[in-house]
Each structure stands twice: as structure tokens, then as C-alpha cells.
Amino acid sequence: VARGDVKLNPSQNAAMEAAMSRRLTIIQGPPGTGKTHTAVATLAQLAREGRGPILATAESNVAVDNLLEGLLNTGVRAVRIGRPVKVRETLRAATLDAQLEDHPKQDEIAIIRDETDEVHRALPKLKGREKGLAHRDIQRNKKEIRRLENEMIQSVLENAEVICSTNIGSGHRMLDGRRFPIVLMDEATQAVE
């Protein structure tokens, strides 16, 4: 039915079809009936249809990791925001932090940091105007690093079909101004707010 051939039983398939065709859908059922499995299949299908970017959330880190793992197994480009130490070890490569570490702009940032360190080391020997110019260069470099880091974050998020986060994490400032035509909340009954 979805990318990666996620197999659904008839009731799961009906739930997925409802979720894809209605503005709001609640899927409920006892534990172990495949609600998360259905959520993953739905997200994969929506991603395949290009209906993103999609925000997928859950109250707990474990539940978010389950969504992320299912999405990655179906070939969806998903990224996990949040603290990497809270993410299952096998999924860390899909975290925003891990993808930023491997980003091509890191080389440019390293050069600027080296240059800034060099200026810092020279500061005690400088006086007057030279010292003022050195401080200006340090501030300029810090600003450039922040700009590059923000560009990296935006490029990773823009490349993702699905952004996964805890409910609390979905309020992070890095998502400010970002519009999600589709939001899926797994285990919504556990949400505190």
C-alpha cells in the first residue's frame, strides 16, 4: 500500500484511507492493534504523494523513535529533532544533530573557527585600534557561524519529507514560521497539553 510495501489489514487500510481523505481523523484501538504501524503507513503514503512537509509527533521519545524507525524502514526521508541522547542509538544518524555534523558547510565553519581562535590567541599582544579590530573580527566570525548553522538546519529540515519530534519538541524555535499542511500525533491520549 505504501512505500516499502507496508502491509495493512482491512481495518488498518480503512483507517489510513480515512486519515488521508479527511481534515481530522482519530484512530483508536486497544494496545497491539497496529495504530503506530498504520500511522507509519499513512505517513509513508503521504510522503510518496508529496503532501509534505509533515510533522509527526508523540508524547514520549520511545513513541517518536518507533515512528522514525518505521519511516526509515519504508524509505521516507525523515529527520528527528530533539536531544540525541534521548534517541535510540540505532536511529541517531537520522537526528538533526548527526546530519548537521556531516553537513558540507561544517568545513567552512571549521575554517572560521580556526581563524577566530587565532585572533583570540593574538588578543593579549594587541593594543588600541588593532585590539578593537580584532574584537570586531571575532564578533563578525561568530555572526557568520550562526548564519551558516542556521542555513544548515534549514537545509536539513527542507530535505526531510517528515520531521519527527516529541510534542514538546515541536514547539522548538527552529520550527518557527515553518508550515506543516499535515500533522500526525501518535499516542495522542498520552499528551499532557
Where does each model-flagged region fall?
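Conserved P-loop NTPase motor core of helicases/translocases
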Residues: V1, A44, G50-T57, A63-V183
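N-terminal pre-P-loop "Q-motif" helix
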Residues: D5-R23, T38, S165
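Active-site-adjacent beta-strand anchor residues
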Residues: N9, T57-A58
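Short hydrophobic/aromatic beta-strand immediately N-terminal to the Walker A/P-loop
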Residues: T25-I26, L55
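Walker A (P-loop) phosphate-binding loop of P-loop NTPases
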Residues: G32
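Motif I (Walker A/P-loop) of helicase-class P-loop NTPases
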Residues: T36-A44
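Walker B catalytic acidic pair
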Residues: E187-A188
